[in-house]
A protein has these predicted regions:
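Nucleic-acid endo/exonuclease domains
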Residues: 1-143
Length: 143
């Protein structure tokens, strides 16, 4: 990866400091569902795009009966990415009811053949995103 690509990633991710210590301006893009992306979703989407990841669907409903959405999904390879915000602020994903609901969702996804990658705040790194892209590419090649 060259320096231009890394700089692009840094500029597209407001939580990342650029080498000179400045922070890029935050950006907000509308999701296909009509709501705005969280800063964590923006960070992931920006990193994914900068690394030339394959197209993903956001807010993808994978279950035939339940209305559970994945934050991002690559349906052709049954690969999902779930962003787990609020780990340090007693967010929904870490409180009892939300945690149990997430367990039900992830278990149902597994039973349907989905691979779910869970990324918490601080885990959206070039290395982790490249690992997910590699997983998708390998599954595509195996078809």
């Amino acid at each position: 990866m060259n320096g231009d690509k890394l700089l692009k990633i840094a500029r597209e991710n407001p939580d990342v400091a650029i080498e000179d210590g400045t922070h890029p301006e935050p950006r907000s893009k509308a999701k296909s569902s009509g709501r705005k992306r969280s800063s964590l979703e923006q960070q992931f989407a920006g990193t994914w795009a900068a690394l030339d990841g394959p197209p993903l669907e956001d807010e993808y409903r994978f279950h035939p009966k339940r209305r559970w959405p994945f934050d991002f999904a690559h349906p052709a390879t049954k690969t999902a990415i779930e962003l787990e915000g609020g780990a340090w602020s007693n967010g929904r994903h870490t409180r009892g009811k939300g945690f149990i609901a997430d367990c039900e969702k992830y278990n149902a996804a597994g039973l349907l053949g989905w691979t779910v990658f869970r990324l918490a705040t601080g885990m959206i790194t070039v290395a982790n995103v490249q690992d997910i892209i590699g997983h998708i590419r390998r599954k595509e090649a195996a078809k």
